[in-house]
Amino acid sequence: MSFFEQQEEEVHSLWVEKYRPTKLDDYVGNENLKAKVKGYIESGDIPHLLFFGKAGTGKTTLAKLIVKNIDSDVMIINASDENNVDTVRNKVKNFASGVGFKKYKIVILDEFDYMTPNAQALLRNLMETFSRHCRFILTCNYIEKIILPIQSRCQSFQIVPPTKKDVAVQIAKILKQEEMQFNPTDLVPIVDGYYPDIRKIINTCQLACVGGV
């Protein structure tokens, strides 16, 4: 097995990726927002979107579900790693301005609150310049770190985490799929300790099972 095949296998073995929802109907919570998203998908037309809320609550998952169901070319950038003007000027602009063969080009900028103010200002210009065929989906933990001109150009939605009960039900389903023996009461301290970070809860459960904790 090559290094890259090994890395891919490791990613797929992570429960948080293995059990990431692949259909909008499998996405738990935020029912009003799901209804709006279904409307976007059915019409084949979406605005610029800004999803904000606490870490691990499904912002990126929802963004990926949208682009999966919209006829589009997609670029995904993690702004916590690439957060400067060069990223916007080179990577994003080149993608947005290039020739495309689908209805839209969609750029997902994950953890956008890490982007510098100058980079955000430049992105605002790109949102206007390429508005005919390019859409941006931004996710962030702290909406107050996003400049107002970008907020005003997006439909903004707060992602509310599912209830603790719903999270526990989802975790139980994962454990059953993995054929793990467990007592439902064992989930209580993990869910209570890391809620509302669903990603952290899933990772902790996997670590506990693998490590025999």
Give the label of every model feature segment:
Residues 167, 171:
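Conserved Sensor-2/SRH helix of P-loop NTPases
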Residues 1-157, 165-166, 176, 184-192, ...:
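P-loop/Walker A NTP-binding region and its immediately flanking N-terminal helices
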Residues 180, 193-213:
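AAA+ ATPase "lid" subdomain C-terminal helix
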